[in-house]
Design a protein with these regions (language model features):
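Generic structural signal for hydrophobic core residues of well-folded globular domains
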Residues: 124, 128, 150, 154, ...
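Post-HExxH zinc-binding segment in Zn-dependent metallohydrolases
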Residues: 66, 137-188, 206
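Alpha-helical scaffold elements that line and support the substrate/ligand-binding pocket
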Residues: 123-132, 147, 190-208
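Beta/coil-rich, acidic/histidine-enriched accessory regions frequently appended to metallopeptidases
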Residues: 8, 219-262
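Active-site rim elements
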Residues: 56, 178-188, 199, 213, ...
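Active-site-proximal structural scaffolding
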Residues: 63, 140-143, 190-194, 205, ...
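Zn2+-dependent metallopeptidase catalytic core
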Residues: 1-139, 143, 150, 154
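Acidic helix/loop microenvironments that form the catalytic cleft of cell-wall polysaccharide enzymes
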Residues: 148, 211-221
Length: 262
């Protein structure tokens, strides 16, 4: 499968793993190709045994529908085939670059196919961002936020340890990662702000995910302006959240979507 790559991979890390991988890990292998679908070739690490087979079957059963839905959100673009590897571990998921279609998905305990499918959506949608080339950057906070929102839309029950909204709500100052974009996909504070803001656009203001994706820009503030023609993105967002979650009080939020707030 090749040697360790020195370039920083693009990752989908569970909370508490914000220490980004410094290089793509050596592929464990050997792998068994379990099967191929219309969109994807799915293999599992042999060390996973029958659990790997079952997880691969779960992914094969869902990946075409998942890729099809992501394609709909991205207005029908097609990035080509995906090569999926299910690996032992709890690292989340990664690929070598935003455009890389070789995706590595963690098996976790080997018993939750929907979790692995959520990881797949989170990496697949980043490839679509790269192909779309409209401003969403999978290696930056706003692109990572979009990745998580889309993955949770497909598998809402699996967000769990990947929820990021509280990381931003529970800071002392709630920094403005709407007007600015942080050039990392591993800071749960900026990612949490981004995920909350995208859900604000969708579930508070009523814009479809397809419209939000199409409004891509280098900052979420510009996405908001593209959609609304207004320039008060962070003020409107932060003022609304302050009403529900007063600054300085633990939010208790366990999802990335507290909207609508009435």
């Amino acid at each position: 499968m090749g040697d360790i790559q020195t370039a920083k991979p693009h990752v989908f890390l569970p909370r508490g793993s914000e220490h980004a991988l410094t290089g793509v890990p050596a592929h464990l292998g050997p792998y068994t190709l379990r099967g191929s679908s219309t969109t994807s070739d799915v293999s599992y690490d042999n060390s996973l045994g029958t659990k790997g087979q079952t997880l691969a079957d779960d992914v094969l059963a869902q990946c075409d529908g998942d890729v099809g839905q992501v394609s709909t959100w991205f207005s029908g673009i097609a990035p080509g085939r995906f090569t999926l590897f299910i690996d032992p571990g709890t690292f989340g998921a990664y690929h070598a670059s935003c455009a890389a279609t070789e995706l590595h998905l963690a098996a976790f305990d080997g018993n939750n196919g929907d979790l692995v499918n959520m990881l797949n959506v989170a990496e697949v949608d980043e490839v679509f961002m790269a192909v779309q080339n409209a401003g969403w950057d999978c290696g930056a906070s706003h692109g990572e936020g979009l990745s998580r929102v889309l993955a949770a839309e497909r598998y809402p029950a699996q967000l769990d340890g990947f929820a990021s909204g509280a990381a931003w709500l529970d800071t002392s100052d709630r920094p403005d990662w709407v007007s600015m974009t942080e050039p990392t996909d591993t800071d749960y504070v900026s990612i949490g702000c981004a995920a909350l803001f995208i859900n604000f656009l969708c579930h508070q203001l009523g814009y479809s995910l397809t419209a939000i994706v199409a409004a891509g820009a280098p900052t979420l503030a510009q996405v908001y302006t593209n959609l609304t023609a207004k320039t008060d993105a962070f003020v409107a967002f932060s003022t609304l959240l302050q009403r529900r979650f007063p600054l300085g009080t633990p939010s208790g939020l366990t999802t990335d979507n507290p909207f609508p707030i009435l």
